[in-house]
Amino acid sequence: MRPTLGLFGGTFDPIHIGHLRLALELKQQLQLDGMRLMPCHLPAHRDQPGASSTQRATMLQLALAACPELSIDLREVARARASYTVDSLSELRAELGAETSLVFCLGTDSFAGLDRWHRWQELLQLAHLVVVERPGWDIPSTGPVRTLLAQHQGAPGQLRLAACGSIVRLAPRLLPISATEIRQLIGAGQSPQFLVPDSVWQYIGQERLYR
């Protein structure tokens, strides 16, 4: 049977319970063999993070210590330059070979602007895309992203039939937690306990992050 690997990229500034639950639910719902969380160094399409790449990677490692079903991929942090998904997928394809099904997971908000990504037309030559429905966001009714979806939309079962090339839309359970709100809580002197893993909250306190 074709091996499958899920990839969940993000800034993770900081990693929180919502990230972890979503990654685990995607792995289980799609019946993936593995799921890697892949923090970016410098996000190409977002504001600069409040914590350094090293600090965000450390928080992610602390969070995943209690979840053996999830793992971390630090290739984008190690690049020490702007992160482009197409570069990471190209590296993974070279490492894992042509048979492994790569499944890159992203939100509706990110997918809606996919045509602004670096070399976006190459993404489906390297991986499948799983688009996670997010409340308040929708895919444009016209334009290149809508055309791409119409040409490549498929069912979850197709993720094992080919190594790349399909777009699957999913509406998993989403916890209403955001990294922005967590940073705002900390900045206001309040505790984000139970929104982030205890080990992450302890590290944030030690490093005096987001104050």
Curated annotation (Swiss-Prot):
Coiled coil: none annotated. Its EC number is 2.7.7.18. Gene3D superfamilies: HUPs. Keywords: ATP-binding, NAD, Nucleotide-binding, Nucleotidyltransferase, Pyridine nucleotide biosynthesis, Transferase. Disulfide bonds: none annotated. The keyword DNA-binding does not apply. One of its GO terms (biological process) is NAD biosynthetic process. Pathway: Cofactor biosynthesis; NAD(+) biosynthesis; deamido-NAD(+) from nicotinate D-ribonucleotide: step 1/1. InterPro entries: Cyt_trans-like, NadD/NMNAT, Rossmann-like_a/b/a_fold. It catalyses: nicotinate beta-D-ribonucleotide + ATP + H(+) = deamido-NAD(+) + diphosphate. It comes from the Bacteria. GO terms for molecular function: ATP binding; nicotinate-nucleotide adenylyltransferase activity. CDD domains: NMNAT. It holds the Pfam family CTP_transf_like. Catalyzes the reversible adenylation of nicotinate mononucleotide (NaMN) to nicotinic acid adenine dinucleotide (NaAD). Belongs to the NadD family. This is Probable nicotinate-nucleotide adenylyltransferase. It comes from Cellvibrio japonicus (strain Ueda107) (Pseudomonas fluorescens subsp. cellulosa).
